[in-house]
A protein has these predicted regions:
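Terminal catalytic/cofactor-binding subdomain
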Residues: 1-119, 235-237, 247-267, 271-276, ...
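Histidine-centered divalent-metal-coordination microenvironment in nucleic-acid enzymes
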Residues: 28, 122-139, 226-230
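Inter-helical turn/loop segments and adjacent helix faces that build the functional surface
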Residues: 138-141, 240
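Aromatic/basic-lined ligand-recognition segments
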Residues: 141-235
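Flexible helix-coil linker/hinge segments at domain or subdomain boundaries
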Residues: 159-181, 258-292
Length: 293
């Protein structure tokens, strides 16, 4: 798998040398149709009806969304599909879907296909789109562990958002604003990478700690060997998601991937510019003689 990923990481992506081997995507939202994969409960995702949040994890089974017992994994009951337009204003199931892990992990070439297949039918301001990237060479990971990466990616996304004519009240702008209350709570523009790389399991109560995972970029090396971008919102509206919303989400992920490769290219150019050639002196040999009397 890694041999193929390494070969793929030498391709061009949007005209830039691609150094990303594998891609992971997390999509949060609400579903009224079976996405064909497990819908995992996520406490940060909220829709404004008390019975919309599932009490247990969910997954798909024979084309139906089902509740699953947390301990046994057995089906508890199927979730009915809304029969009327009024009922469809609220999702049947809420939470997140997570892309496959190795050896079936996504790449820069097929992540969009997966996103189009499983994207939720409803999203709101509580829903996030997280992007994980990994590398065939650990040196590229270490090059990203710097406070400079977050402002670089934020600016790249801001340029993209302006080019897309994204409305001023869209949640993208809130998440790109380091002073927005939601951003400070869920994707703070802080660099905690030196401590995050050591965390071996997901901590939901880590806010305020030196290793909090709730930052714009989370360096979850010890858990997943990935860099996680947590600053994107989901694209769409509570009343429904359109095909263009999904395509805009795909383009947002593409912007994050391209920004990663751009940053790595800049780092490599800087390293070459700062390299110093050292000319070794020829060896000096001295002979010492002794006279014994």
């Amino acid at each position: 798998m890694w041999e193929a990923a390494e070969k793929m990481s030498k391709d061009l992506l949007n005209g830039i040398r691609n150094r990303i081997a594998l891609v992971g995507i997390e999509l949060e939202g609400g579903w009224n149709r079976d996405p064909g994969t497990s819908i995992i409960r996520d406490g940060s995702v909220e829709f404004h009806r008390s019975d919309a949040r599932p009490p247990r994890p969910m997954r798909s089974a024979n084309g139906t969304i089902v509740l699953v017992d947390e301990n046994s994994g057995r089906i508890v009951e199927p979730m009915a599909t809304p029969a009327t337009a009024a009922a469809a204003r609220y999702p049947t199931a809420i939470g997140e879907v997570v892309s496959p892990r190795p050896p079936n992990a996504l790449t820069v070439h097929n992540y969009a296909v997966w996103m189009r297949k499983v994207y939720p039918q409803m999203v709101n301001e509580t829903c996030g789109l997280h992007v994980h990237v990994s590398f065939a060479h650990r040196l590229n990971y270490s090059r990203l562990i710097t406070p400079d990466l977050t402002p670089f990616v934020v600016e790249q996304l801001a340029q993209w958002g302006r080019a897309e004519c994204i409305p001023a009240d869209h949640m993208l702008w809130a998440r790109l604003n380091p002073d927005h209350p939601w951003t400070r709570q869920h994707c703070a523009h802080l660099f905690l990478g030196d401590n995050q790389v050591k965390v071996v399991k997901k901590e939901y109560n880590s806010r305020g700690t030196p290793h909090s995972r709730y930052t714009f970029i989370n360096y979850c090396e010890a858990q997943h060997h990935t860099v996680e971008y947590r600053g994107l919102p989901m694209f769409g509206r509570p009343e429904g998601v359109t095909g263009e919303d999904i395509e805009q989400a795909v383009r947002a992920v593409s912007t994050v991937l391209t920004a990663t490769n751009k940053f790595l290219s800049k780092i490599r150019q800087r390293e070459r510019a700062e390299s110093v050639a050292v000319v070794a002196r020829p060896p000096i040999m001295q002979e010492f003689g002794a006279v014994i009397r």
